[in-house]
Structure formats: structure tokens, C-alpha cells
Amino acid sequence: MAQIRIHEVNTRIENEVEVSKFLQEEGVLYEKWNISKLPPHLNENYSLTDENKAEILAVFSKEIADVSVRRGYKAHDVISLSNSTPNLDELLINFQKEHHHTDDEVRFIVSGHGIFAIEGKDGTFFDVELEPGDLISVPENARHYFTLQDDRQVVAIRIFVTTEGWVPIY
């Protein structure tokens, strides 16, 4: 279950109902998908082949199709980041630059953890700490950045309206 940390006051929201309510009020789509469907050989696997990525997409194809129909998404892929990723530190520096997109930024966490820091409606930032099974959609034009948690590894399904709209605007 995702957790929220509000930057300015350093308070946390950990209750599932309160997390969902907070994100809904901020215009952030949050869903919990059934991660137990993931085959054991793909659980915590950060060295994915193209076949592994296709299998992950197949396992969650119903959920991807459902959210895509509801939200107008048209493309998806799988990304894996870990300490074995070439230039991981350089990638994280780029990810941590505050930016926005002209489309939603959608991630479903398959393995590992990630944090989206999002500028709230009141102008203050909050972290959404994600774990396997969490799906988040950062709304278009919302200022945000992404980073990894202490384990420095994540496998995520990325879902797009268009890949062109996903280009960061700093």
C-alpha cells in the first residue's frame, strides 16, 4: 500500500483509506492491482529479458486494458532499474529534476519501490512511496519528480497516452 509524506510538515499518511482519499483530492489516480498474479520467477527479478517483459505485460493485460479504456492510454512498456543498470546514478539525477508532462505519467510497480514527489494543489510537495501492486497516474501538467527508495531497484509498467506527450518539460 502506498504511503504519503508531506514535505513541509514532514507528516505521514499510512492508512489505506486516508491515502486513497488524499490522492483523490489531489487529482492523482491510485489503484491497487493484484500483484500475487506475478509468476515467482519474475518476482524481484531486475535483469529482465524481452520475453520476461512481455510476460509481465501479459499477466497484467486485463488491468492495463481496463485503465487504458477508462483514461485514453494507448501505449505501454516495462522498465527495470537496479544497481546493475548502467549509469543508474546519472539516470536518477535526471529523474530527480522537477518537471511536468503534457500527458499523465502512469506507473504500476511490479517489483521494488519508487517515490513520486508531486506538487500539490496548495503548492507544497508530497511524496507517494510506492510498492509492488501500486498503480499511480500523475496528472498532466503536475510538477513532479521520481526517485528510488533505499533498495535502489524497481520494475514498473509504464502506460502512456502517447510517447510524445511523455517528454519531460523542465
From Swiss-Prot:
Binding-site list for Ni(2+): 99, 101, 105, 144
Reaction catalyzed: 1,2-dihydroxy-5-(methylsulfanyl)pent-1-en-3-one + O2 = 3-(methylsulfanyl)propanoate + CO + formate + 2 H(+); 1,2-dihydroxy-5-(methylsulfanyl)pent-1-en-3-one + O2 = 4-methylsulfanyl-2-oxobutanoate + formate + 2 H(+)
Keyword Transferase: no
Pathway the protein takes part in: Amino-acid biosynthesis; L-methionine biosynthesis via salvage pathway; L-methionine from S-methyl-5-thio-alpha-D-ribose 1-phosphate: step 5/6
UniProt xrefs under InterPro entries: ARD (IPR004313), ARD_bac (IPR023956), RmlC-like_jellyroll (IPR014710), RmlC_Cupin_sf (IPR011051)
Domain of life: Bacteria
Record protein name field: Acireductone dioxygenase
Organism per entry: Bacillus thuringiensis (strain Al Hakam)
Gene that encodes it: mtnD
